[in-house]
């Protein structure tokens, strides 16, 4: 579809959406349908520490901040295939990194700023490779840490292991993508940061990097937008995101600015769309309790039940 036609879809009538959207340029679905990233949390109980966590995140006086937008602001990802050369990477945190090799090269996009994330999806194997503090280094690649994920699996990283994110979670599954907004539905939670995290993690997170302040949320904490939030004044495209925030919510995945949520680099994002998302107040979110949904400690799979009420359809 021509970019102008896609923009017309976002600006006007949104097309019906399938239950999942493959990574653009691949046939790879991002995790199975019973993965926690894709859990509908709209009916889950409110977490008993919801108000405390929101207080530490300054929710009362803060609005959401889209950490992406035009012209090239956000997190890159690259699609590769079996023809791309694989390399070994020298890791700072090798004991908590997957050894690889990685399809990383001088052609790989690296996120700007201090985190320098590099995300690569192998379209032939549906494998996600992620690096933190990635540096090509003249053909002697280095990174702070690295993680490899089978996009067809619910397996989590070993407990206590970091990833390219402080929470030990994958980054790509939590990024807002333009193709999803244009299709009319987002079927997963979105990655969010906060300045203050407690030095602990809860499912599905696997790693902590916080403080001893128990008022702060742990890595893996999940927040959903209240069902009563009025989206009538927002554009059709912004309402797609609002619906996802009500249904799938936000997962605390890293330390950073309060209520910053991430998306991919895409030249089709517009300032008007991003500015609308900045009007969503953080006080309209609630932390949810996912403990009743977990199938097993080392799995990202969820199972509906009395303690995990999931809407049908």
Predicted feature descriptions by range:
Residues 21-313:
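Short, surface-exposed polybasic-aromatic patches that bind anionic ligands, especially phosphate groups
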């Amino acid at each position: 579809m021509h970019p102008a036609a896609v923009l017309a879809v976002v600006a006007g009538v949104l097309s019906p959406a399938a239950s999942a959207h493959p990574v653009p340029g691949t046939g790879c679905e991002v995790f199975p349908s019973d993965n926690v990233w894709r859990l509908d949390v709209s009916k889950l109980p409110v977490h008993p520490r919801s108000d405390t966590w929101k207080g530490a995140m300054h929710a009362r006086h803060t609005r959401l901040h889209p950490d992406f937008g035009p012209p090239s602001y956000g997190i890159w990802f690259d699609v590769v295939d079996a023809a791309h050369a694989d390399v070994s990477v020298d890791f700072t945190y090798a004991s908590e990194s997957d050894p690889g090799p990685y399809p990383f090269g001088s052609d790989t996009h690296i996120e700007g700023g201090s985190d320098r994330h590099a995300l690569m999806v192998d379209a032939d194997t549906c494998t996600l490779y992620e690096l933190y503090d990635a540096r090509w280094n003249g053909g002697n690649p280095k990174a702070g840490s690295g993680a490899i994920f089978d996009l067809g699996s619910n397996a989590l990283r070993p407990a206590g292991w970091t990833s390219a994110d402080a929470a030990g979670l994958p980054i790509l599954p939590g990024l807002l993508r333009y193709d999803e907004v244009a299709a009319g539905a987002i079927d997963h939670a979105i990655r969010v940061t906060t300045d203050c995290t407690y030095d602990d993690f809860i499912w599905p997170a696997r790693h902590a990097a916080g403080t001893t302040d128990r008022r702060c949320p742990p890595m893996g904490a999940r927040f959903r937008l209240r069902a009563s939030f009025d989206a009538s004044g927002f554009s059709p495209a912004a309402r797609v995101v609002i619906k996802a925030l009500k249904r799938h919510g936000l997962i605390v995945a890293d330390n950073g600015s309060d209520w910053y949520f991430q998306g991919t680099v895409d030249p089709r994002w517009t300032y008007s769309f991003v500015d609308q998302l900045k009007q969503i107040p953080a006080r309209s979110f609630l932390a949810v309790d996912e403990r009743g949904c977990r199938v097993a400690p080392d799995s990202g799979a969820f199972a509906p039940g009395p303690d995990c009420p999931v809407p049908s359809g």
